[in-house]
């Protein structure tokens, strides 16, 4: 498939916590959409291997959430480290989107970008410096149009691919119910 500079790269990662200095990436997923938010391609979801010492250091919320979803077991069983995960995701992106053209898209995406800058810097460098953060619209709708904000249904599975799909659906909801698109 040819690269398209108008495609959007949606990314989500699950981490062992919120601090890039001490926590690590344990799952990564990427979805490519066209500019109208239609899915073009999905990368294989990667559980990123981390040693037991990293997993044992997770706080209770992360232990429970990632344990219940099965992610902790998938991370332990994975043979793919951070460098290999980064290389696989870069190879996927090179098929679909030219470097430096797509903003990093997602929900609270700056958090993912912080981890990526530290642990997957080549992947982070593929993106445009801008972010398309759905949480910005969420915060505005919450304050300006609460009925639109309340219309978003989220399951909050904290699984990378499911979270991306929810973010895309959420942006569609805001596009259709909050933003006025005049031709």
UniProtKB/Swiss-Prot annotation:
GO terms for biological process: DNA metabolic process. Keywords: Cytoplasm, Exonuclease, Hydrolase, Nuclease. It is found in: Cytoplasm. It comes from the Bacteria. It is an enzyme of class 3 (hydrolase). This is Oligoribonuclease. Its EC number is 3.1.15.-. The gene is orn. Residues 8-171 form the Exonuclease domain. Its main location: cytoplasm. 3'-to-5' exoribonuclease specific for small oligoribonucleotides. One of its GO terms (cellular component) is cytoplasm. Belongs to the oligoribonuclease family. The active site is at 129. One of its GO terms (molecular function) is 3'-5'-RNA exonuclease activity. InterPro entries: Exonuclease_RNaseT/DNA_pol3, Oligoribonuclease, RNaseH-like_sf, RNaseH_sf. Pfam families: RNase_T (PF00929).
